[in-house]
Swiss-Prot record:
Subcellular location(s) per record: Cytoplasm
Function: NAD-binding protein involved in the addition of a carboxymethylaminomethyl (cmnm) group at the wobble position (U34) of certain tRNAs, forming tRNA-cmnm(5)s(2)U34.
Record's subunit section: Homodimer. Heterotetramer of two MnmE and two MnmG subunits.
Database matches in Gene3D superfamilies: FAD/NAD(P)-binding domain (3.50.50.60), GidA associated domain, C-terminal subdomain (1.10.150.570), tRNA uridine 5-carboxymethylaminomethyl modification enzyme MnmG/GidA (1.10.10.1800)
Binding of NAD(+), residues: 274-288
Family affiliation: Belongs to the MnmG family.
Protein name from the UniProt record: tRNA uridine 5-carboxymethylaminomethyl modification enzyme MnmG
Cofactors, names only: FAD
InterPro entries per record: FAD/NAD-bd_sf, GIDA_C_N, MnmG, MnmG-rel, MnmG-rel_CS, MnmG_C, MnmG_C_subdom, MnmG_C_subdom_sf
GO CC, one annotated term: cytoplasm
Length: 635
């Protein structure tokens, strides 16, 4: 009988979901094993080495506010940072960091190795140990090792049945240079899980020494660096590197159109769906045929790495055509290609088979997170990873699971979409996916998530003290701004009236001034009316709370109204086929996905408001009949 080691939680896969899951479980006191195919590729960024961007930055901030790691990693290893959408409202402000991929992987590996309760091990999991009551009991590896655990988290990324394509040539691989994981897909199918195929891709890398930078448009980082983490201990001031911008040409487009038949998608070699919001260059040329040019960003992969990432230029063209294609771009006429672009096709588990806790519906104690659930992006993976890690630990410890409501965070929006929508293409989080984005801003992620992180046990005393001090300073500044007044005839009052093209009648509070269009806290500071002792985040927090107070209150009222109705639980044994007043499609969808609440039911594709109304009426009729029976029995 082979020796079997025992743990509380086992995490399979050490990408961005696996790292967050393992750290969360270990920090919550569980003996945790993190199994990976390659100990030298932990926390690797195989595509664009970057963190953040629209909606993704909100996820990174939220993970950090809960006690996770991705934001700290970006703050420690960035090459460049920029705030996107800075000229628009705070709901869509987005911090983005270009990171050093080797440094990022080295730092996260060090964090994992130094984490108490966590052990790392190299191995390929091929089978799950399942108990008599459909509960997970552990895993076995390709070479026959067994590990027991009460909870297992699958975070296998693109490695299940992974196959990479360059033109019409393919090979089994989870990503370039790393073999695919075999056996686990068949295990999941045997257990009754539905699996399907998705694809993604990554562009070529070119030698930075072969590029003519004089023909590129520099894209410098912001002079004032912003941070993903709310913990100043993670902040590292460092020199920033520029990125660059070029554009496709008519020659680029012609070369692609002439050779579309040689790509794996247009040549018919694969039919898996790729990411809608990160299309290949050939998809762009086909879908936007009237567009004469597309922006292409040239981004460094590291301080000591000669490779440049060609963002927006992923392709499935054969390798011998890729260099010619790259050399049609201004500035890259003499470039040297170091790695070809490729597409990767892989197995995934549609996440409608998961509860909102990310535990699977079929097997108790089995959790699924990250790209395996059909998402794309490191931030989406990290968000799911920390949720799975938290809930796996709570499952092992006999505590109630944590469900993140969609109105409370982008994490909640992401997971609710995954668990209720029949998604058949890689899912990317977007600000437009949230109905409550004015409330779910990056700047207040700590206000929304850190109290929960503290309650769960991931926020220590030092972090909690930092949080309380920050909130107290914001509240005090709001009070000052609503009380301090500027008089009409004061020199500063006259200067502000001239600047804003609006008179001050008698006097106005600083809060009144902040409510004026295009007048901000930085303008108060210019007139000597700010508080120089406050941090930027505290100044912005006070300004946003005042400037957008009416909008925030209205949206919060909408949330409160929706929550009252949407959180109404649905019976787990509800027979949807009996609700004949509902359309057949809606009955079938509800029976298939088994939503836990009325809110979840309303967001399932194929279920419309009339169906929800019919469901409500049916529930009320059933409740009334039950009440009448109970009353009759009492009599």
């Amino acid at each position: 009988m082979p020796h079997t080691e025992e743990f509380d939680v086992i995490v399979i896969g050490a990408g961005h979901a696996g790292c967050e899951a393992a750290l969360a479980a270990a920090r919550l006191g569980c003996q945790t094993l993190l199994l990976t195919l390659n100990l030298d590729r932990i926390g690797w960024q195989p595509c664009n080495p970057a963190v953040g961007g629209p909606a993704k930055s909100q996820l990174a901030h939220e993970v950090d506010a809960l006690g996770g790691e991705i934001g700290k990693m970006a703050d420690r290893t960035y090459l460049q940072k920029r705030v996107l959408n800075a000229s628009r409202g705070p709901a869509v402000w987005a911090l983005r960091a270009q990171t050093d991929k080797r440094e990022y992987a080295a730092v996260i590996k060090q964090v994992l190795e130094q984490q108490p309760n966590l052990r790392l091990r190299e191995g390929m999991v091929t089978d799950l140990l399942i108990g008599p009551n459909d509960e997970v009991q552990g895993v076995t590896t390709y070479f026959g090792s067994s590990f027991r655990a009460k909870a297992v988290i699958l975070t296998t990324g693109t490695f299940l049945g992974g196959c990479i394509w360059v033109g019409n040539k393919s090979m089994p691989a989870g990503r370039a240079g790393e073999f695919a994981a075999v056996g686990l897909t068949e295990t999941l199918q045997r257990l009754g899980f539905e699996t399907d195929r998705l694809k993604t891709g990554t562009p070529a890398r070119v030698d930075k020494r072969s590029v003519d930078y004089s023909r590129l448009e520099p894209q410098p980082g912001d002079p004032e660096v912003r941070w993903f983490s709310f913990d100043p201990e993670a902040w590292v001031e460092r020199e920033q590197l520029p990125c660059y911008l070029t554009r496709t040409t008519a020659e680029t487009h012609k070369l692609i159109r002439d050779n579309l038949h040689l790509t794996p998608v247009y040549g018919g070699y694969i039919d898996a769906k790729g990411p809608r919001y990160c299309p290949s260059i050939e998809d762009k040329i086909v879908r936007f045929a009237d567009k004469e040019s597309h922006q292409i960003f040239i981004e460094p992969e590291g301080r000591d790495i000669p490779e440049l990432y060609i963002q927006g230029f992923s392709t499935g063209l054969p390798e011998d055509l890729q260099l010619a294609l790259l050399q049609t771009l201004p500035g890259l006429e003499d470039c040297v290609m170091l790695r070809p672009a490729y597409a990767v096709e892989y197995d995934y588990l549609p996440a409608t088979q998961c509860l909102p806790t990310l535990m699977t519906r079929r097997v108790e104690g089995l959790f699924s997170a990250g790209q395996l659930n059909g998402t794309t992006g490191y931030e989406e993976a990290a968000a799911q990873g920390i949720v799975a890690g938290i809930n796996a630990a709570r499952f092992v410890q006999g505590q109630d699971a944590i469900v993140f409501p969609r109105e409370g965070s982008y994490i909640g929006t992401l997971i609710d979409d995954l668990c209720t929508k029949d998604l058949r293409e890689p899912y990317r989080v977007l600000t437009s996916r949230s109905e409550y984005r004015l409330l779910l801003r990056a700047d207040n992620a700590d206000q929304r998530m850190t109290p929960l992180g503290r309650e769960i046990g991931l926020i220590d005393d030092r972090r909690w003290a930092l949080f309380e001090q920050k909130q107290a300073r914001i509240a005090a500044e709001q009070t000052r701004l609503t009380q301090q007044r500027v008089k009409e005839h004061d020199p500063v009052g006259q200067a502000i009236a001239q600047q804003t093209q609006a008179p001050i009648k008698g006097s106005a509070t600083l809060a009144d001034l902040l409510r004026r269009p295009n007048f901000h806290y930085i303008d108060l500071e210019a007139h000597g009316l700010g508080d120089p002792s406050l941090a930027i985040a505290e100044k912005e927090g006070a300004e946003i709370a005042i400037k957008y107070a009416g909008y925030l209150q209205r949206q919060q009222a909408q949330v409160d109204q929706v929550v009252r109705q949407s959180q109404r639980p649905l019976p787990v044994d509800l027979d949807y086929s009996a609700i004949t007043s509902m359309r057949l499609e809606a009955r079938e969808k509800l029976a298939r996905f088994r939503p836990l609440t009325l809110g979840q039911a309303s967001r399932i594709g194929g279920v419309n408001p009339a169906d929800i109304n019919a469901l409500l009426i049916w529930l009320e009729v059933q409740e009334r009949q039950r009440s009448q029976v109970e009353t009759a029995l009492v009599r």
